[in-house]
Amino acid sequence: MLSKQIPLGIYEKALPAGECWLERLRLAKTLGFDFVEMSVDETDARLARLDWSREQRLALVSAVAETGVRVPSMCLSAHRRFPLGSEDDAIRAQGLEIMRKAIQFAQDVGIRVIQLAGYDVYYQQANDETRCRFRDGLKESVDMASRAQVTLAMEIMDYPLMNSISKALGYAHYLNNPWFQLYPDIGNLSAWDNDVQMELQAGIGHIVAVHVKDTKPGVFKNVPFGEGVVDFERCFETLKQSGYCGPYLIEMWSETAENPAAEVAKARDWVKARMASAGLVEAA
């Protein structure tokens, strides 16, 4: 019987860097997490994962089986470098090929959700053409994901195109496909001028996972928990009352810290205390 406990995961970049997934999952288990979210970012090292051999993919599956710690989701931020909205046909084609490889990788290793970065372009100037190309690229991507039975889920971003659940829902309605859903980041959502609780309620029925981090207006990374603007207890209460029962993922970038495990444990305790206050988990 599946546990009724709220699944709590940790982002790969919060844990010590390296390519040994068995060690990473063992550490996550020691720290009390149910799952780890993989990062495939714009660096060559992490992009290379999409070209892993059959044996390398099987090693990840074996590590999950041995530890009991799942890798159910991938944060695919590589499209910053190879955006689907690029006006350069070669770059856009690379972006679509990355998407194809990511979906195939997910299918092979059991990843269920690929979180997408909501940028039409990132390092270039956006315009009507980049937005049109982005929409078309999403349509092609969702068609591929549908055939593979892998969910693509749009993150709420640090970027105006996709800085609210309402905007992401526009794409969900446009695509009208069950394999395209939403993966809000309550930090990013709170850093903009949004009615955060109304936005969370609007997304219910489409939210497949939630990123948990703190932010300040204009500062979207590395804000220590409790020092930003996010009202965590209210967000957790709203999600619970709205019927959301899915996973929460603590997003941190402490892989290069002096003691990443200690940083993660501190954040875990802080977040779980707020979850307990909101009635999501039992108090420690």
Swiss-Prot record:
One example GO MF annotation: L-ribulose-5-phosphate 3-epimerase activity
Keyword Isomerase applies: yes
Catalytic activity line of the entry: L-ribulose 5-phosphate = L-xylulose 5-phosphate
Top-level lineage group: Bacteria
Species, as recorded: Salmonella typhimurium (strain LT2 / SGSC1412 / ATCC 700720)
Biological processes per GO annotation: L-ascorbic acid catabolic process; L-ascorbic acid metabolic process
EC number: 5.1.3.22
Keyword Isomerase tagged: yes
Name this polypeptide is given: L-ribulose-5-phosphate 3-epimerase UlaE
Family label: Belongs to the L-ribulose-5-phosphate 3-epimerase family.
Pathway note: Cofactor degradation; L-ascorbate degradation; D-xylulose 5-phosphate from L-ascorbate: step 3/4
Keyword annotations of the record: Isomerase
Function noted in UniProt: Catalyzes the isomerization of L-xylulose-5-phosphate to L-ribulose-5-phosphate. Is involved in the anaerobic L-ascorbate utilization.
InterPro entries, sorted: L-Ru-5P_3-Epase, L-Ru-5P_3-Epase_Enterobacteria, Sugar_Epim/Isomerase, Xyl_isomerase-like_sf, Xyl_isomerase-like_TIM-brl
Expression triggers: Induced by L-ascorbate. Repressed by UlaR.
One Pfam family this sequence matches: AP_endonuc_2
Signal peptide positions on this chain: none
